[in-house]
């Protein structure tokens, strides 16, 4: 049975719009895969994740450094994104101390979204059996990545509206538990 992808998104409180953008981006993927999204400050969830995403803005906040340490210690794949902004001295030091990461710079939220989606697609293409990616979905992902690399369409940047929190994105047909029903569903089972 396919496994839901467990992703941990580590970011300072000031990066809430960026974190929200990443959560929304997962729902855009053209594949039928379930996602479990955990986020700062849930340090205990880092060892259970399959993938660790780090977003660095102007400053670094606790416990982001500890979360990164746990991700490295438990050998998680790390996706690192750094906003193209001036950083505080602490933010500069954190970036320098972690220069070994494959940092992807982004200038705005649409650029972050594109970089993140490319990385997620590549991750899924490396592990198709584990996450239940079919041959057709793999080809669709390759086409999706090609579109991302060609287009640089802008998305409106706004304030966070709540989609950046932790959550679960269910894959219809793959994540349905027998006898389960939606909250608020009044039909009898």
Where are the predicted features?
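C-terminal interaction surface of TIR/SEFIR-family domains
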Residues: 87-187
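Conserved N-terminal substructure of TIR/SEFIR domains
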Residues: 1-54, 140-189
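Cross-kingdom TIR/SEFIR domain
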Residues: 20-32, 41-126
């Amino acid at each position: 049975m396919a496994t839901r992808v467990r992703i941990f998104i580590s970011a300072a409180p000031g990066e809430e719009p960026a974190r929200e953008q990443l959560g929304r981006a997962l729902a855009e993927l053209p594949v039928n895969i379930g996602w479990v999204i955990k986020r700062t400050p849930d340090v205990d969830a880092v060892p259970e994740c399959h993938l660790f995403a780090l977003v660095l803005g102007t400053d670094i906040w606790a416990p982001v450094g500890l979360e990164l340490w746990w991700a490295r210690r438990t050998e998680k794949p790390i996706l690192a994104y750094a906003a193209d902004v001036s950083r505080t001295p602490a933010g500069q030091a954190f970036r320098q101390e972690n220069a070994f990461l494959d940092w992807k710079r982004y200038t705005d939220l649409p650029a972050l979204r594109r970089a993140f989606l490319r990385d997620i697609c590549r991750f899924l293409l490396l592990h198709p059996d584990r996450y239940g990616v079919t041959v057709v979905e793999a080809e669709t992902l390759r086409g999706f990545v090609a579109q991302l690399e060609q287009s640089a369409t802008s998305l409106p940047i706004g304030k966070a509206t709540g989609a950046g929190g932790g959550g679960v994105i269910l894959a219809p047909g793959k994540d349905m538990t027998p006898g389960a029903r939606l909250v608020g569903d009044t039909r009898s089972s």
